[in-house]
């Protein structure tokens, strides 16, 4: 168990997907919003295929609106919050009820606010945190870059949507491989990662 935690290996029965605050009011202000939501929707489809638990939050929905329909989360419970962190008492209780839970796969907005606060709280609780970089964004690409760097410094694993789904499958003989393969057959839309990763010193060991 300790070696799995140290290297950040994902398992479908020990992981949960977090989708953070993909709401209507952010549509016009978040850089690459359509692409981020599209990638997060892929993650949600994959989680459903693999029968993984999913947590979806809405930050002050009275002011920021509902979750956008293109995420494909109709019928799923939405946890309302006002804290930046997704780790509210209700959600923490939910996590504690899941046997053998080790890894949280994290997507959403904004990277420097709710995503980073959530990641740091989860790391502090001893969970492995996998930040899906192509499914997280901010109003500012500078904030996005430094938040990703900060989370990595604190012990989170930066990854991509396709990387996560393939690691969760683990084997082409997995009974759900063909179904998940259809989700990732086309490359994920460009969410601007290459343009912000031009500061290699931020990500040096």
Curated annotation (Swiss-Prot):
What Pfam families is this protein classified in? Answer: Isochorismatase
Q: What is this protein called?
A: Isochorismatase domain-containing protein 2
Q: Which InterPro entries match?
A: Isochorismatase-like_dom, Isochorismatase-like_sf, Isochorismatase_domain
Q: Which domain of life is it from?
A: Eukaryota
- Identify the species of origin: Xenopus tropicalis
The UniProt entry, under SUPFAM superfamilies, shows: Isochorismatase-like hydrolases (SSF52499)
Q: Which family does it belong to?
A: Belongs to the isochorismatase family.
């Amino acid at each position: 168990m300790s070696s799995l935690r140290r290297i950040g290996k994902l398992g479908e029965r020990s992981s949960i997907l977090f989708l953070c605050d993909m709401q209507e009011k952010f549509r016009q202000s978040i850089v690459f919003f359509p692409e981020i939501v599209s990638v997060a929707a892929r993650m949600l489809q994959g989680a459903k295929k693999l029968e993984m638990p999913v947590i979806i939050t809405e930050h002050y929905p009275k002011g920021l609106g509902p979750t956008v329909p293109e995420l494909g989360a109709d019928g799923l419970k939405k946890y309302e919050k006002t804290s930046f962190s997704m780790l509210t008492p209700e959600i923490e209780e939910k996590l504690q009820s899941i046997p053998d839970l080790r890894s949280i796969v994290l997507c959403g907005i904004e990277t420097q606010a709710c995503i980073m606060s959530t990641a740091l709280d989860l790391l502090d609780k001893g969970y492995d945190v996998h930040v899906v970089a192509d499914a997280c964004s901010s109003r500012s690409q500078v904030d996005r870059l430094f938040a990703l760097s900060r989370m990595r410094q604190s012990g989170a694993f930066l990854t991509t949507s396709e990387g996560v789904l393939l690691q969760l499958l683990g084997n082409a003989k997995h009974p759900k491989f063909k179904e998940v393969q259809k989700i990732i057959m086309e490359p994920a839309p460009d969410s601007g990662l290459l343009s912000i990763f031009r500061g290699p010193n931020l990500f040096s060991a």
